[in-house]
């Protein structure tokens, strides 16, 4: 059997870039909760003892940006300088202006346009991907890397591994078989975890705890064998982390946020953006389309692309590729997709309920992936029924 290796990585919520994603989305949540028509483009950067939020926000909401920054950092676990950032004593800088009136008139007519007439907030192309290799209809390498990161945070916060600190990264290499275009996982080839830790723990203790409390509960035993390679804190020391170790910036983890290197990516980040920004809403609707294609049995694996022009409601193009796994021709799948899904940004916002903030709705997306999550707030993960007739054998 001819197999190949493919690798996906993830970072957990204490990684400096992910910290920034979460702050940007916490700001978005706060704006949308009070004013669903908020126009938000919120960026965050962080370094030692400092967090800055900046961008363009037009909203009727009364938002305390500094309070949001400090709470988000505190909830992650950045409560002292020695873990990478002190949420209550760090400098918080705010540089927020209103959305450009040029963009406002072209996209939403200064809030006068009907939902179906709202134009895309910018040009761009977005991809949605789905594969039948996991129940989530997501790539196994990405699912495992993401879940390992989430587990690291869980055992840190519940005290199972008290030596853990907030920052950490994971990476999983899976051996696959290509079954006529569909991806079939055979085994896990390599597991890599690099996690921030305190001064008291030894490398042997780190390795033992990671295997017992993180890897064992997450990676199914059927994928592990005597040849599986484990790299557990291979650098030997990771005490300095968070924004103290590396500068952080919103939007630098776009592959981790999506499909772990599978499918494709148009380059636009998600966090801190309201649904008129098609980088986010466009990517969400094509994930729903791709997932629905696979869940309804039209294909075992597929990718869907959509593209936009600023100020124009209708997409410029929609594309479907089933990698040869389709039960009907791709052009017929495309026809079904176009008949079922409304790709206009204003309608995406309504159909996926993307103007609703609060309850950490978007903050939840900003760590451990935007796709493949079992959560009612992830409305784009709901499979839509697709009408098609299976060809006669």
UniProtKB/Swiss-Prot annotation:
EC category name: transferase
Record keywords: ATP-binding, Cobalt, Cytoplasm, Magnesium, Metal-binding, Nucleotide-binding, One-carbon metabolism, Potassium, Transferase
InterPro entries (UniProt xref): ADOMET_SYNTHASE_CS, S-AdoMet_synt_C, S-AdoMet_synt_central, S-AdoMet_synt_N, S-AdoMet_synthetase, S-AdoMet_synthetase_sfam
Positions of Mg(2+) binding: 9
Cofactor comment: Binds 2 divalent ions per subunit. The metal ions interact primarily with the substrate. Can utilize magnesium, manganese or cobalt (in vitro). Binds 1 potassium ion per subunit. The potassium ion interacts primarily with the substrate.
Residues binding L-methionine: 56, 99, 246, 277
Chief location category: cytoplasm
Residues noted as binding K(+) in the record, renumbered to the chain: 43
PROSITE patterns, per the entry: ADOMET_SYNTHASE_1, ADOMET_SYNTHASE_2
GO MF term set: ATP binding; metal ion binding; methionine adenosyltransferase activity
Keyword Transcription: no
Protein name per UniProt: S-adenosylmethionine synthase 2
Species per Swiss-Prot/TrEMBL record: Daucus carota (Wild carrot)
Lineage of the organism: Eukaryota, Viridiplantae, Streptophyta, Embryophyta, Tracheophyta
Gene from which the chain derives: SAMS2
């Amino acid at each position: 059997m001819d197999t190949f290796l493919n690798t996906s990585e993830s970072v957990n919520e204490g990684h400096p870039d992910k910290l920034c994603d979460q702050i940007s989305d916490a700001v978005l949540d706060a704006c949308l909760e009070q004013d669903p028509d908020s126009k938000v483009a919120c960026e965050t950067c962080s370094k030692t003892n400092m967090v800055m939020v900046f961008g363009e926000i037009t909203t009727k909401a009364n938002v305390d940006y500094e309070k949001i920054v400090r709470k988000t950092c505190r909830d992650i676990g950045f409560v002292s300088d020695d873990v990478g950032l002190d949420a209550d004593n760090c400098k918080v800088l705010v540089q927020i202006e209103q959305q450009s009136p040029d963009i406002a008139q072209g996209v939403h007519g200064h809030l006068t346009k009907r939902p179906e007439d709202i134009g895309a907030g910018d040009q761009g192309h977005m991809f949605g991907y789905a594969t039948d290799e996991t129940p989530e209809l997501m790539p196994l390498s990405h699912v495992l890397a993401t879940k390992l990161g989430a587990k690291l945070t869980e055992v840190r916060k519940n005290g199972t591994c008290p030596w853990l600190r907030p920052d950490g990264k994971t990476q999983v290499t899976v051996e696959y078989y290509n079954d006529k275009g569909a991806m079939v996982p055979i085994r896990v080839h390599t597991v890599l975890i690099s996690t921030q830790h305190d001064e008291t723990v030894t490398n042997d203790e780190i390795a033992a705890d990671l295997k017992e409390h993180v890897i064992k509960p997450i990676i199914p035993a059927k994928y592990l064998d005597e040849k599986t390679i484990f790299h557990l804190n291979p650098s030997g020391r990771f005490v300095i982390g968070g924004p103290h170790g590396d500068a952080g910036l919103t939007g630098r983890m776009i592959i981790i946020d999506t499909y772990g290197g599978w499918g494709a990516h148009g380059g636009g980040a998600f966090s801190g953006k309201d649904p008129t920004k098609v980088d986010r809403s466009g990517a969400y609707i094509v994930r729903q389309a791709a997932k629905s294609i696979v869940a309804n049995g039209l294909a075992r694996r597929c990718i869907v692309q959509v593209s936009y022009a600023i100020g124009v409601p209708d997409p410029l193009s929609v594309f479907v590729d089933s990698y040869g796994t389709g039960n009907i021709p791709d052009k017929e799948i495309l026809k079904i997709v176009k008949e079922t899904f409304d790709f206009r940004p204003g309608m995406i916002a309504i159909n996926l309920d993307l103007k609703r903030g609060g309850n950490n709705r978007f903050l939840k997306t900003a760590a451990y992936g935007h796709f493949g999550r079992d959560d009612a707030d992830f409305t784009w993960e709901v499979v839509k029924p697709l009408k098609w007739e299976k060809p006669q054998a």
